[in-house]
UniProtKB/Swiss-Prot annotation:
It holds the Pfam family UDPGT. GO terms for cellular component: endoplasmic reticulum. Possesses low quercetin 3-O-glucosyltransferase activity in vitro. This is UDP-glycosyltransferase 72B3. Its EC number is 2.4.1.-. UDP-alpha-D-glucose binds at residues 277, 347-349, 364-372, 386-389. Keywords: Glycosyltransferase, Transferase. GO terms for molecular function: quercetin 3-O-glucosyltransferase activity. PROSITE patterns: UDPGT. It comes from Arabidopsis thaliana (Mouse-ear cress). The lineage of its organism: Eukaryota, Viridiplantae, Streptophyta, Embryophyta, Tracheophyta. Belongs to the UDP-glycosyltransferase family. Gene3D superfamilies: Glycogen Phosphorylase B.
Length: 481
């Protein structure tokens, strides 16, 4: 935590390792480039996970972490969606946060700034009590942020379920969106998850700024729109890409097995297949994907989890409860042993995406994974599952960074479609076009992080504001001595 007049920022990530990773990278940048100290304040409804501890314990001493007591969610139905559980966890952690800020204030170590993510805006209540500047870190892209900023207006003007809309919604700066592609909580406006999303979005106006994990080359038109001043809209700063800089919590045997296997594959020949830390497939979709990969004849590295009927079922527990290999089609491993490698639950994605044998990534379009692919120039097959991933997929396809696997009438991507899109990416003309676009975006992602780059300048602007507020807090504290 902060000593003396060192600028001090507190960060509250929402539960889930995917929320933590980009904020860790932000903390590193604040430390290395701007001399801040950072305190992570971790809410949860259970003891911290091994993955959380591994990530936080790997950080420099100037980045501290405090785990708040677990929030009591015993009254929350087991069927509650992840957005509801996350929001309630943060909201019910406010008393513990208030106590922590009181202690820090008494010790003259109160942070100047509090950074929360999408579901953490109720922590602004505590920030206001202690005159701490509230900011939002939006971990996804400016396209989805623009949609969310427009959501309260949509809520007022649209009476039906959004999924029932017959025409795409046109929002300035956004890719046209059909209702069924809206972020997951918007698919049922009567569900508590939608009410919590709307509640948090309506509090965005209380922030003094919104930091976005994207960059100008990826979304030039959207960024112009979202940065235009408007009533009740805080300044928006593009500071990305912030991506995982290395592996944490690795299973050493699996790590070396898959990386050594990649070492023996031809350049650009392997399709990496993974649905992130929280995504799972239905049993039928799991089988169709397996058979499609085999039918494609292309090399692949597939990270598998046991199938489930809920796309986000691994969100709070990324380890498969059952043996995922037992669900593979009979004879699949023998049939594909010359060209494929299957690993269970986890793989060192940061290292995999930098490997020269990787020629593509079949992804759930989580924004962390999407950005990791972009900074490494790896072309994508978009296979969104939950959260805002359908909107991410729309953006990635629209800019030419991804091909899209098409759903059948039964809602399943069939084996023939899997084989078609895999072959198209690895060896087809459409794959070559995506590779070319990804090369351009990779170059842009490097450019914006140079000393004179767009994202570097944006974070510089924010850091100057934060340092000024720290000086103000220090002066106020000294006046009481």
């Amino acid at each position: 935590m902060a000593d003396g007049n060192t600028p001090h920022v507190a960060i509250i990530p929402s539960p889930g390792i995917g929320h933590l990773i980009p904020l860790v990278e932000l903390a590193k940048r604040l430390l290395d480039n701007h001399g801040f100290t950072v305190t992570f304040i971790i809410p949860g409804d259970s003891p911290p996970s091994k993955a959380q501890r591994s990530v936080l314990n790997s950080l420099p001493s100037s980045i501290a972490s405090v785990f708040l007591p677990p929030a009591d969610l015993s009254d929350v139905p087991s069927t509650a969606r992840i957005e509801t559980r996350i929001s309630l966890t943060v909201t019910r952690s406010n008393p513990a946060l208030r106590e922590l800020f009181g202690s820090l204030s008494a010790e003259k170590r109160l942070p100047a700034v509090l950074v929360v993510d999408l579901f953490g805006t109720d922590a602004f209540d505590v920030a206001a009590e202690f005159h701490v500047s509230p900011y939002i870190f939006y971990a996804s892209n400016a396209n989805v942020l623009t949609f969310l900023l427009h959501l309260p207006k949509l809520d007022e003007t649209v009476s039906c379920e959004f999924r029932e809309l017959t025409e795409p919604v046109i929002i300035p700066g956004c890719v046209p969106i059909t209702g069924k592609d809206f972020v997951d909580p918007c698919q049922d406006r009567k569900d508590e998850s939608y009410k919590w999303l709307l509640h948090n979005v309506k509090r965005f106006k209380e922030a003094e700024g919104i930091l976005v994990n994207s960059f100008v080359d990826l979304e030039p038109n959207t960024i112009k729109i979202v940065q235009e001043p408007a009533p009740d809209k805080p300044p928006v700063y593009l500071i990305g890409p912030l991506v995982n800089s290395g592996s944490h919590d690795a299973d050493v045997n699996d790590e070396y097995k898959c990386l050594n296997w990649l070492d023996n594959q031809p350049f650009g020949s392997v399709l990496y297949v993974s649905f992130g830390s929280g995504g799972t497939l239905t049993f039928e979709q799991f089988i169709e994907l397996a058979l499609g990969l085999a039918e494609s004849g292309k090399r692949f590295l597939w990270v598998i989890r046991s199938p489930s009927g809920i796309a986000s079922s691994s969100y709070f527990n990324p380890q498969s409860r059952n043996d995922p290999f037992s669900f593979l089609p009979q004879g699949f491993l023998d049939r594909t042993k010359e060209k494929g490698l299957v690993v269970g639950s986890w793989a060192p994605q940061a290292q995999i995406l930098t490997h020269t044998s990787i020629g593509g990534f079949l992804t759930h379009c989580g924004w962390n994974s999407s950005l990791e692919s972009i900074v490494n120039g790896v072309p994508l097959i978009a296979w969104p599952l939950y959260a805002e991933q359908k909107m991410n997929a729309l953006l990635l396809v629209d800019v030419g960074a991804a091909l899209r696997a098409r759903l059948g009438e039964d809602g399943v991507v069939g084996r023939e479609e899997v084989a078609r899109v895999v072959k198209g990416l690895i060896e087809g003309e459409e794959g070559n076009a995506v590779r070319k676009k990804m090369k351009e975006l990779k170059e842009g992602s490097v450019r914006v992080l140079r000393d004179d780059g767009f994202s570097t300048k944006s974070l510089n602007e924010v850091s100057l504001k934060w340092k000024a507020h720290q000086r103000k807090i220090d002066q106020e504290q000294e006046s009481f001595l």
